[in-house]
Amino acid sequence: MCVFFATFAENFNYSMALTRTYYRVAEHLFAVDSSYSELLQCMTNYEPFAVEELLGERRKAKGERREDEEIFTLRVEKAIGERLKAKGEGWTHVLTDNAEEDMPRIEVYKARRREGDEAKGEKGWLFRVAMVANAPLCCEMEWSEDFTPGVLHIMADCQDVRFCIDNALMLLYAFRTAPLMTLEMHAAVVVKADRCAVRCQTAALLDRPNGLIDQQELGYLFLGHSGTGKSTHARMWLEAFDDAWLLNDDNPILRVMEDGEVRVYGSPWSGKTPCYNNAYARVGGLVKLSQAPHNKIRTISLPEAYAYMLSSASGLKMDRQMADSMYETIKHVITHVKCYHLDCLPNTEAAEVAQRGMV
């Protein structure tokens, strides 16, 4: 983990030249620009998703549009003072999210539109982030209205650069991909041998040759609020079944493909468990977990499934267009994937009950 006990300004050497790196997550391409050569040391969790050969190809293309155009670019800079120089100066405060004291505080501002102003550059969003509720700001994120280009301003006295990078990319990715039938989920995902083939894009991570898994496998998403036991239940599957493996422990990506297939992908974001698998599986089931003195699984109704999925999906739900996009994606998922509720204990019997109930 890249946590600095000196400041950002003391640890990072500035260069006039921008370095661009490309990453592909759930088959969506994005880019990160920075003038700080040490930045990549903080981004080891992104290495399995790096697309190293792309930069040279882009240079040869000389500006020609490619089918795999990046969906957004994030530029990382050191902040020179706060972007919000005075409260309300050009920005309208629309939300502060700090539900728990030990969780990050996120302040959301929307740029005010001047009368007759239709220029994209004059509209957008400003997110101000602190590591915990009462801490000073560690970074500010300034994005266009459609979340295509973005700038991450890291405060000079920031002690945890990776925290800033991860949060900026997680938020930008979630917001930008919402219209693309993609959802960034708060869930743990286990893949188990079943009826569907899985392609692993980074074979070394799973120690399997040629990037292929010669089994029929499905991915199962375990949903629930923080503290429910998603990671614990996923671990029970690994203990109960020899052919099960962990795809992601906290922030998988759910995507509806052009042919309607629903897939779950690994991501560079995985909470406390370092699980950065660049792989995917067809979704076999979504399971809402509840702690209970017994193990029991049941199929749930579409309204229940919608509510559980919406609460587990990352997105700026106050934005009408984004909310509509999320609705369409969730509607497709819950009508094409079986959804369940599992009352469970933290034991392997819970995994066995869940697995039998989803057959």
List each model region and its residues.
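A noncatalytic interaction/capping subdomain that flanks phosphate/NTP-handling catalytic cores
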Residues: 15-56, 67-193, 217-223, 236-245, ...
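Conserved glycine(s) of the Walker
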Residues: 229
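Compositionally biased low-complexity segments enriched in histidine and/or tyrosine
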Residues: 2-3, 83
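Hydrophobic positions on the alpha1 helix immediately C-terminal to the Walker A/P-loop
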Residues: 233
